[in-house]
Amino acid sequence: MHHCKRYRSPEPDPYLSYRWKRRRSYSREHEGRLRYPSRREPPPRRSRSRSHDRLPYQRRYRERRDSDTYRCEERSPSFGEDYYGPSRSRHRRRSRERGPYRTRKHAHHCHKRRTRSCSSASSRSQQSSKRSSRSVEDDKEGHLVCRIGDWLQERYEIVGNLGEGTFGKVVECLDHARGKSQVALKIIRNVGKYREAARLEINVLKKIKEKDKENKFLCVLMSDWFNFHGHMCIAFELLGKNTFEFLKENNFQPYPLPHVRHMAYQLCHALRFLHENQLTHTDLKPENILFVNSEFETLYNEHKSCEEKSVKNTSIRVADFGSATFDHEHHTTIVATRHYRPPEVILELGWAQPCDVWSIGCILFEYYRGFTLFQTHENREHLVMMEKILGPIPSHMIHRTRKQKYFYKGGLVWDENSSDGRYVKENCKPLKSYMLQDSLEHVQLFDLMRRMLEFDPAQRITLAEALLHPFFAGLTPEERSFHTSRNPSR
């Protein structure tokens, strides 16, 4: 069996006009071609686009692009990577696709509107004063035009670019009100719907900060927020790379089992805190989980005859609360990025906290193997893959769903002789067949994942139960502690 190392792209929102979806080509010309490259070939650049055709992988697996919708019905953007960027270097920028959604006031390519906020403090350099005297500009899509050396709120000095997405951009700043501490400043587009979405996220972040006064629950904390000439801005601490970016830069070599165990424990700890406070994240994925410090050492793997990066510190933080939902709030029909989306969401049966548990199960598999468990972009195929890997969908869920078009006489309608059918048959095996070793700790990990991947959310393990699973018995006392040197008031 030959499996890929995950090449995917953000899920399009079927309800929003500014997201898109290309149908896969089923032409004979491409039928039968492998979705994944040979292991002997260098790994292709990954794509997050939802197009999933049968074209050669060189075309299909393009550089990841972000199609953020920022909490509008369904959000698949990877804010974790956009908050802080792939590393702390100040020269990086990533290619993004921006949605075509724009307003009349941003019809012109670029326009000047206001005077940029500046400081009169004598300690500031003459150069900074000159830069701050420029008028504030938005580009045609409402992104704030900002440059290295600009100041915001007479406090934040921009020193680098961290990333850009449909929601806005993230810049690295020095916070002069906090001793020039480094922060990641997310600057939202000057568009009404994104402004409102940012206010919703700020509300969630305020609640988290209120409930986590001692900063023990491993969620990224907001240090400040403000409205800068129509741009909602949120300041966060500057962290390391997200866990997907590290995996990608490590040639998709999976994380060692001890690393998987420690990250899994922290994930369960953080999400249990959210769930106990009636909050569901709804968009858990490796991009939204960041290392506190992503420094690494390079080791030689004799078994694979190659060098591998090993992160020195596996402490993580959970990020991106833009689509987090309180129990009392309206629950949109579709949540979660495709590859981490549970069956109850696909079948439109309603969702709650167990939605996050399913996502964690998928994430742990990806850490362990280096590729996604469900490599698909279409509902019917996704359900078929679930059955191939996890067994049959419970009959009571089939009877309750409105999506009867996927079923006939209690079973999924699926042509195993089609191109998709052959792919699923060849690449999707029972979950335990993906186990790399049959030692006790590997068996325990797969038992935990299987309990997280129960079809019925009512039968799915809770995170309080997961923290007591035997898989975590191998943690050191230091790994079980959640001390942090961060200052919550920063």
Swiss-Prot record:
PROSITE patterns given in the database record: PROTEIN_KINASE_ATP (PS00107), PROTEIN_KINASE_DOM (PS50011), PROTEIN_KINASE_ST (PS00108)
Pfam families attached to this UniProt entry: Pkinase (PF00069)
Tissues expressing the protein: Endothelial cells.
Basic and acidic residues compositional bias, start-end: 26-56, 63-76
Gene Ontology molecular function terms on file: ATP binding; identical protein binding; protein serine kinase activity; protein serine/threonine kinase activity; protein serine/threonine/tyrosine kinase activity; protein tyrosine kinase activity; RNA binding
Active-site residues, record numbering mapped to chain: 283 (proton acceptor)
Sequence positions that bind ATP: 162-170, 186
This protein's UniProt keywords: ATP-binding, Cytoplasm, Cytoplasmic vesicle, Kinase, Nucleotide-binding, Nucleus, Phosphoprotein, Serine/threonine-protein kinase, Transferase, Tyrosine-protein kinase
EC number: 2.7.12.1
PTM annotation: Autophosphorylates on all three types of residues.
Protein kinase domain segment(s): 156-472
Gene Ontology CC terms: acrosomal vesicle; intermediate filament cytoskeleton; membrane; nuclear speck; nucleoplasm; nucleus
Modified residues (Phosphotyrosine): 7
One of the protein's GO biological processes: protein phosphorylation
Chain intervals with Low complexity compositional bias: 117-130
Reaction(s) this enzyme catalyzes, per UniProt: L-seryl-[protein] + ATP = O-phospho-L-seryl-[protein] + ADP + H(+); L-threonyl-[protein] + ATP = O-phospho-L-threonyl-[protein] + ADP + H(+); L-tyrosyl-[protein] + ATP = O-phospho-L-tyrosyl-[protein] + ADP + H(+)
CDD domains in alphabetical order: PKc_CLK3
Keyword Kinase: yes
Span list, region Disordered: 1-138
UniProt cross-references to InterPro entries, sorted A to Z: CLK_kinases, Kinase-like_dom_sf, Prot_kinase_dom, Protein_kinase_ATP_BS, Ser/Thr_kinase_AS
Regulation: Leucettine L41 inhibits its kinase activity and affects the regulation of alternative splicing mediated by phosphorylation of SR proteins.
Function of the molecule: Dual specificity kinase acting on both serine/threonine and tyrosine-containing substrates. Phosphorylates serine- and arginine-rich (SR) proteins of the spliceosomal complex. May be a constituent of a network of regulatory mechanisms that enable SR proteins to control RNA splicing and can cause redistribution of SR proteins from speckles to a diffuse nucleoplasmic distribution. Phosphorylates SRSF1 and SRSF3. Regulates the alternative splicing of tissue factor (F3) pre-mRNA in endothelial cells.
Family classification: Belongs to the protein kinase superfamily. CMGC Ser/Thr protein kinase family. Lammer subfamily.
Name used for this protein in its record: Dual specificity protein kinase CLK3
Native source organism of the sequence: Homo sapiens
Name of the coding gene: CLK3
